[in-house]
Design a protein with these regions (language model features):
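Short, basic/aromatic recognition patches
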Residues: 60-67
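Conserved active-site alpha-helix within GNAT-family acetyltransferase domains
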Residues: 23-36, 116, 128, 140-157, ...
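Conserved acetyl-CoA-binding loop-helix of GNAT-fold acetyltransferases
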Residues: 105, 111-124, 148
């Protein structure tokens, strides 16, 4: 751990991310090695992709539009209201695992089901590949949504850096 902490400390913006079920232990080890907790609120979650909807979802609001694309093997989904992005996310496949990332709903569009919608749109794109499981890192708010969609927690995600500002790097 000491050598990883030293490498992390070499660059102020570098973050050491630890997947663990013993966050307290690594928080203490980090402190002993000059690192501070910059996030302890995320979890890693998985899902059996057989439980996910394989069809493109339908938007019930005519003012919203779904656009999907694929760039360099990464599938993107964006829901927009005119020129404004209401929700977005991406998924890429490694082996038989769909890795969901950067799922965001703009504050003005939250509590309208767009997070679920984006996840379903991305799952439909992931099914273009032979996928068995899904994987993601979830914020506190995301954990509620993903649990509702059948995802389960595997472990906690602890982020350590030399920054002592106490800001949660998992937000935003």
């Amino acid at each position: 751990f000491g050598s990883l902490a030293a490498k992390t400390a070499e660059v102020p913006s570098r973050v050491l991310t630890i997947l663990t079920n013993d966050a307290a232990r690594y928080s203490i080890l980090g402190q002993r090695n000059g690192l501070h907790v910059t996030s302890a609120t995320q979890t890693m979650m998985i899902v059996d992709m057989e439980t996910q909807d394989a069809e493109d979802p339908w938007l019930s609001d005519d003012d919203l539009k779904l656009e999907t694309s694929r760039t360099d093997g990464v599938h993107h989904a964006v829901v927009s209201a005119g020129e404004e992005v209401a929700a977005s996310g991406r998924v890429f496949v490694v082996g038989h695992t769909a890795i969901f990332d950067n799922i965001v709903t703009s504050p003005a569009y939250q509590r309208r089901g767009l997070g679920s919608f984006i996840m379903k749109a991305l799952a439909a794109q992931a099914f273009e590949h032979d996928v068995d499981s899904g994987l993601l890192l979830a914020s506190l708010d995301g954990q509620k949504l993903y649990s509702h969609l059948g995802w389960r927690m595997v472990c906690h995600v602890l982020m350590l850096s030399t920054s002592n500002e106490g800001s949660d790097l998992s937000v935003g």
